[in-house]
Amino acid sequence: LNNPPIPGKQSLAKGSAIPLVKPVEYSTASWRRAVLSLDEHYKAWLLWNYSENTCWEHQVEITQWGWSAFAAQLDGKKMAGKTQERLRALIWLAAQDVKSELAGREVYQYKELAGLVGVSEKNWSETFTRHWLTMRAIFLRLDQASLLSVSESRSEQVAFNLYALN
C-alpha cells in the first residue's frame, strides 16, 4: 500500500516489450493509494461519490457516519420517537441529495421530501427543514474534508517517495 509504483516492461520475443502497467494506470496509482489510506468514512464517501462505486458497505459507512455526526449536533435534545425515525430515514436521502448537487443534477424539493417522509408540507417546514439542512451541511463538509484529506495524503506519499528515491 505504501510502496511506490515501479515501472517495468514485459519482454517479448525479438527484443520488443510491452508495458506491464498502462501509463494512465501508472500515473493515477498514487491517487488510488491515497484514497485507500484514508479513514473509512472519507474513503467510502470518495469511492461512492466520485467513482460510482455502489458497494453496500460504503453506503452503510456513509449513513452510519452521517447519522452519528447529526446525532452529535442534536446534543441530547428531546425528540419524539416517530420524528427521530423519520430523520433516520432522511440521512441517506441527504447524502444522495448532496451527491446530486455536486454532480450538477436536480436535488430534492421540500414537497417531495415531505411526501417521502409521510408528513404534511406544513409539518415539514416546521419540524424537518432545519434538520434536513443540517444533514446536507454535514455531507457537504464530509465532501470538503475528504477531498482535502486525499490531497494531503497523496502529497505526503509523493514527498516520501521522492525522498526515498534520493
Regions found by a protein language model. Give the residues of each.
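Short, amphipathic alpha-helical "recognition" segments used to contact nucleic acids or chromatin
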Residues: W48, C55-W56, Q84-Y108
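N-terminal interaction/assembly modules
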Residues: L1-K78, E106-N123, F128-N166
